[in-house]
Amino acid sequence: METKISVLIIEYFAVKRKLISDLINSSPKLQVIATASNSKFATNKLKKHKPEVILMNLEENNIKDILFLEEKNSLNKTIPIVVTSSNQNLINIAASKGADDLILVSKNKKSHEIKKEQIINSLLAYGSISIKNKIACNKDMKTKNYERANFILNHKNDISSLNQLEEHAKEKTLNEKEIKKLKLRKFDIIAIGVSAGGPVALKSILPEIPESFPPIIIVQHMPKGFTEEFAKNLNNLCKISVKETTNNEILKQGYAYISSGGYHTKIKKIDGNYQIKTLDGKHINGHKPSIGVLFQSIAEIAKDKAIAIIMTGMGNDGSREIGDIKKAGGLTIAQDKESSMVFGMPKIAIKENNIDYIVPLSHMVKLLKAILINS
């Protein structure tokens, strides 16, 4: 018999806890193993039951439970959490605190029933990832990989490799000579594509980026209405300015632009300046905004003046299009398996030989500084 994905539910009202539990248990692949009325009880049950995925319904009556997102990270960073709420502001806050998926529901009694398919699909996706992570987890190997990566990036005179952590990719080398060659190049723009696990990953790297960096355009898979607040929250953490994309805006050094939810983002070049072009239209690779759309535009317009980075995420959005940037002469980087919450998009990009360098999240900015900052 197939093992079911275990779910912990956090919901303030007992009646609604029962409704949500019944909804989840209606799936033959899911099983509610524990419920909690607040974050205090949830913390205890998390330790006891060790679920594969958590569903939190966040509303104004339990707003303090937002702190559970931070508490959960200190207890077990590998357990994904899906947040539902009828409050847009709370959804935005949850995104900034590292929720893995966000589902806006209505305020009526059947709010979760209406979004049943989306909720179940999200729990199945993240629960499956959690199970795979448990199986693959080897703390000794992980420690060795990070120690090796740390040695590589902190010993410039003896850089023999920037890591090959995926069996299908060729080992990438970056020595002093190659760094010097990269330093001679002029990079005008950095493009980042990220999905599941992105809010936490971006919160980790963006505060390290100096104002001297070229403009950064980021596609984080988020629906319409979420990205403005997400950008504001990141802006409060960073030296650079972080904002949501605006159509026809000129890209500036020291800025990061979060692609507006519900729209695709491209770039164009007018009078020597890169400008943002926001577009409506159908979903591409299952997403709007699509990483693939941005990367194709970067390949066509910025060409060898671009650095493209593909990070944690499910699926293949951007995985093939980043190869267009490589073919155009741009520099391509992928987040490694060990530091990716979901090693989907980077894995496919690596398999298809679309990546120049593979690095841990904790060393991403160190690599960029080595290339972009003259010393």
From Swiss-Prot:
GO cellular component: cytoplasm
InterPro entries associated with the record: CheB-like, CheB_C, CheY-like_superfamily, Sig_transdc_resp-reg_Me-estase, Sig_transdc_resp-reg_receiver
Reaction catalysed by this enzyme: [protein]-L-glutamate 5-O-methyl ester + H2O = L-glutamyl-[protein] + methanol + H(+)
UniProt keyword annotation of Ribosomal protein present: no
SS bond list: none
EC number(s) given by UniProt: 3.1.1.61
A Gene Ontology molecular function term of the record: phosphorelay response regulator activity
SUPFAM superfamilies registered for this protein in UniProt: CheY-like, Methylesterase CheB, C-terminal domain
Domain CheB-type methylesterase as annotated: residue spans: 183-375
Ranges for domain Response regulatory: 6-120
The organism's place on the tree of life at top rank: Bacteria
Catalytic residues (positions): 195, 221, 317
Pfam families: CheB_methylest
GO biological process assignments: chemotaxis
Hydrolase listed as a keyword: yes
Major enzyme class: hydrolase
Keywords in alphabetical order: Hydrolase
Name of this chain's protein: Probable protein-glutamate methylesterase BB_0415
Organism whose genome encodes this protein: Borreliella burgdorferi (strain ATCC 35210 / DSM 4680 / CIP 102532 / B31)
Species classification: Bacteria, Pseudomonadati, Spirochaetota, Spirochaetia, Spirochaetales
